[in-house]
Amino acid sequence: MKLRPLHDRVVIRRSEEETKTAGGIVLPGSAAEKPNRGEVVAVGTGRVLDNGEVRALAVKVGDKVVFGPYSGSNTVKVDGEDLLVMSENEILAVVEA
């Protein structure tokens, strides 16, 4: 199954959780925080402005992004994988290599 988000929505695959701290301590699954980074896997057509124009999104498929800890409260399961659906304005930054 493939998701096609509407308007200014973005579908994100969350990055893998860190299971070890910088000091080398292994964290159990319940203690590890969910990462607030991910990869954009689908984008909508754009934000519809008050005048009816559509503004293209600033993110694109494949972008690595950072989002807030409470962003993406809408989780959907697609082919056994949990994906986040959020508005573009919930994305804080694009990670550039």
From Swiss-Prot:
Q: Provide the Gene Ontology terms for cellular component.
A: cytoplasm
What transmembrane ranges does the database entry give?
Answer: none
* Domain of life, source organism: Bacteria
Query: What are the recorded GO MF terms, alphabetically?
Result: ATP binding; metal ion binding; protein folding chaperone; protein-folding chaperone binding; unfolded protein binding
- Intracellular or extracellular location(s): Cytoplasm
Q: State how it assembles.
A: Heptamer of 7 subunits arranged in a ring. Interacts with the chaperonin GroEL.
Keyword terms, alphabetized: Chaperone, Cytoplasm
Pfam families the UniProt entry points to? Cpn10
Output this protein's name: Co-chaperonin GroES
Please name the Gene3D superfamilies in this protein's record: GroES chaperonin
Function according to Swiss-Prot or TrEMBL: Together with the chaperonin GroEL, plays an essential role in assisting protein folding. The GroEL-GroES system forms a nano-cage that allows encapsulation of the non-native substrate proteins and provides a physical environment optimized to promote and accelerate protein folding. GroES binds to the apical surface of the GroEL ring, thereby capping the opening of the GroEL channel.
* UniProt record similarity statement: Belongs to the GroES chaperonin family.
- Grouped into one coarse class, the protein's main location is cytoplasm
Q: Which PROSITE patterns match?
A: CHAPERONINS_CPN10
What SMART domains does the entry give?
Answer: Cpn10
Species, as recorded? Stutzerimonas stutzeri (Pseudomonas stutzeri)
